[in-house]
A protein has these predicted regions:
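Active-site-proximal, well-structured secondary-structure segments within enzyme catalytic domains
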Residues: 132, 136-137, 165-168, 175, ...
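Short, hydrophobic/amphipathic alpha-helical patches that form generic packing surfaces
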Residues: 68-79, 138, 142, 243, ...
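Short pre-active-site segment immediately N-terminal to the catalytic Zn-binding motif
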Residues: 451-469
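Intrinsically disordered or highly flexible coil/loop and linker segments, enriched in small
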Residues: 38, 42, 46-53, 69-86, ...
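N-terminal helix-rich structural modules
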Residues: 2-197, 628
Length: 680
């Protein structure tokens, strides 16, 4: 292919230099990736062979600025692998991932390059670098050491080989799970669908139609699975679907992940040992706000002690209602939890998620969320149809700062489709950085899987989907407000256990009447959401909160159990899992189910030895939001301080220093316990 036909290899000529999705074809990736690797290798050679003595500028900054083309291509390719993939893309990923992994390993294990970095690092006292420069030097040096640069001979070769294996296995893990999820469908009759709300019935009928079939079909995608477990009256069907979901990747087929996770855990442990750490968790936590596994266990155990009594009460109350309905010998099982919890929630609060949906029409919610950002930070959003998008469902917005200057591009991608992974996430198509005095602004995307509009009805969100929107939008603000010199430290490039603070703090607004009143209107009548309905949302927001907390703690304990190991694992995965999280489990365990084989966060995502960070960030966000509560939830001074001290700073300083500058104190679990009604 000629270079002038490949959009990656020439100027984009698009608004704000956004990715030219309309021009990119599958055949463009491979040549652009290969050229990107070649270019970066040439840039690295130029650094290594520079006859001048190593300096911060000619070595550290030169390395930071290398690989621009490769970055451009891998960003689009990596993001579309999640949002708009195909069999061809997945085949190409299998082909290119080992090459890309080898390429980055070649850089991080380049001895001459590291010698120059080390030479600069050893002069750091004389150099007296300040702020971001000092941080970049430390981060670069640590990054190389943590990538095996201090290793020699066989150890270095082993490290390289293990990393390549890891990249292949994580990809296989994710693809197995995606294929297993996509392969499941269950056709249901009208009778079997009793109890399910109208919105789900329409969605299941639409799924069948999309697959060219009659009737109704449910799948294991969240918008299909979650309401089914919550509302389906047929207990045996709930059990069947629960088992299908919770035994994914355990079956005797090509998508089984049992051996893969053993290899993943063992390889990560071996990598940590090579670098002189006793466990993989110790290696990971060195670059975390928590710093040690003791600190993680301390948090998980503090929360476990605080929430267990309340969680036991919650389960007893749900079981009591189930027995009232089904008879005294009824035993509550995991496939009953969502169903009877929903019944109890309705009884206690007379609040049905479905009666909220009409007030949360997607475009109104979007206006509300954008409006919140305008009110807090003065920023505005304007759709620009000239900006190319990768799918017709996607919209692109220009975001302007309060002084009218251009701040960022924001893409929104709201609905499920084939080729898009489940869940919700924020990502960047371009980071922010400052070069020669020019502030190059970011391109940020939020991707969800909200129920689609269906026959005659717009997309109506559940309350938890409104929370999800706020959450991902919080990450987007972190990306859009980035204001740092170096792209590798901008936006969400922060310690993992700090990255969820900007997202989770936004969720606090979902139960604030003042915020809901700004946008929640009935999509047919235009009626504002009634005050008593808002009060019910507030009252219900802590419903079964302790049980939910224990569930998160159990995932945190499971994660730590896998990654605090000091010896190779070749045991029974299910038995190990059961033991790891038993003190946080209240409902009976179910034979054959297994979480670990589908726990993407810790096996294939960035949360290995990091799942605790959701709770860590919850402690932070409750503590931080208590300042908004104290000063007024739309207080622009508090918002300006949050933007200045947290959102704009990225990873340029230790997060505890940033947090204390905003909050004036270290965080404590007190605000979270109070918010959850565990203490008064």
């Amino acid at each position: 292919m000629t270079e002038n036909k490949n959009p990656f290899l020439k100027p984009y000529n698009t608004p704000h230099d956004t990715a030219p999705f309309h021009l990119i074809k599958i055949e463009h990736y491979e040549p652009a990736l290969l050229k990107g690797m070649k270019e970066q290798n040439e840039e690295i050679d130029a650094i290594v062979n520079n006859p001048e003595a190593p300096t911060f500028q000619n070595t550290i900054v030169a390395l930071e600025n290398s690989g621009a083309l490769l970055d451009r291509v891998t960003t689009v390719f990596g993001n579309l692998m999640s949002a708009e993939t195909s069999d061809e893309m997945q085949e190409l990923a299998e082909k290119m991932m080992p090459l890309l992994s080898e390429h980055s390993n070649n850089i991080s294990l380049n001895e001459k390059l590291f010698a120059r970095i080390k030479a600069v690092y050893e002069q750091k006292d004389q150099l007296q670098l300040k702020g971001e420069d000092a941080q970049l030097l430390q981060k670069t040096y640590d990054g190389f050491v943590r990538s095996g640069a201090n290793l020699t001979g066989e150890a270095k070769e082993k490290f390289r080989q293990l990393n390549t294996e890891l990249s292949i296995l994580t990809l296989r893990f994710s693809q197995n799970l995606l294929k297993e999820t996509n392969n499941y469908e269950l056709a249901l009759t009208k009778k079997q669908l009793e109890g399910l709300p109208e919105s789900s019935l329409e969605s299941y009928a639409q799924t069948a139609k999309d697959k060219g079939k009659e009737g109704s079909i449910i799948t294991l995608d969240a918008p299909s699975f979650v309401p089914f477990m919550k509302y389906c009256d047929d207990r045996s069907l709930r059990r069947e679907v629960y088992m299908a979901y919770n035994t994914q990747c355990t079956h005797n087929n090509e998508y089984n992940n049992v051996d893969i996770i053993k290899q993943l855990v063992n390889i990560r442990m071996e990598l940590a040992h090579l670098l002189g750490f006793s466990t993989f968790a110790e290696y990971k936590l060195k670059k975390r706000m928590a710093e040690t596994s003791d600190a993680v266990y301390k948090l998980l155990n503090q929360l476990l002690d605080a929430y267990t009594p309340a969680a036991l009460k919650e389960v007893a109350e749900v079981e009591a209602l189930a027995r009232e309905m089904e008879g005294n010998d009824f035993q509550l099982m995991p496939w009953d939890w969502a169903y009877y919890s929903e019944k109890l929630k309705n009884k206690k609060f007379n609040l049905n998620e479905e009666e909220l949906r009409p007030y949360f029409e997607l475009s109104q919610v979007e206006k509300g969320v954008f409006g919140l950002a305008t009110r807090l930070y003065g920023i505005t959003f304007k759709e620009n149809k000239e900006i190319p998008v990768y799918h017709p469902d996607v919209k692109a917005y220009e975001v302007f700062d309060k002084d009218g200057s251009f701040l960022a591009v924001l893409y929104t991608d709201f609905h499920p489709r084939a080729g898009k992974r489940s869940g919700a996430w924020m990502t960047s198509y371009k980071e922010q950085w400052i070069e020669n005095g020019v502030n190059s602004r970011p391109h940020v995307s939020v991707t969800m899987n909200f129920t689609k509009p269906s026959a005659g009805k717009p997309a109506l969100l559940t309350f938890s989907e409104v929370n999800t929107f706020l959450h991902e939008f919080g990450h987007a603000l972190h990306g859009m407000f980035a204001n740092t010199t170096y792209s590798t430290m901008s936006g969400t490039s922060v310690y993992w256990d700090f990255v969820e603070l900007p997202s989770q703090i936004m969720e606090n607004f979902a139960t604030e009447k003042e915020f809901l009143n700004t946008f929640a209107r009935h999509y047919q009548t235009g009626e504002p959401i009634p005050a008593e309905l808002i009060q019910k949302i507030v009252d219900a927001s802590n419903f079964n909160v302790a049980y939910a907390c224990l569930r998160q703690i159990s995932f945190g304990l499971l994660d730590m159990a896998w990654y605090t190991r000091q010896e190779t694992f070749d045991g029974d995965v299910r038995a190990y899992e059961k033991e790891a999280w038993k003190k946080a489990q209240i409902l009976p365990g179910v034979e054959d189910t297994c979480m670990s084989v589908q726990f993407s966060h810790i096996m294939a995502g960035g949360y290995s030895a990091g799942y605790y960070s959701y709770k860590w960030a919850e402690v932070l966000d409750a503590d931080a939001f208590s300042l908004f509560k104290e000063k007024g939830i739309f207080n622009q001074e508090v918002a300006a301080s949050f933007r200045e001290n947290i959102l704009s700073k990225g990873g340029t300083e230790h997060p505890m220093a940033l947090y204390k500058r905003f909050r004036g104190q270290e965080p404590s679990i007190h605000a979270l316990l109070k918010r959850n009604g565990i203490i008064n």
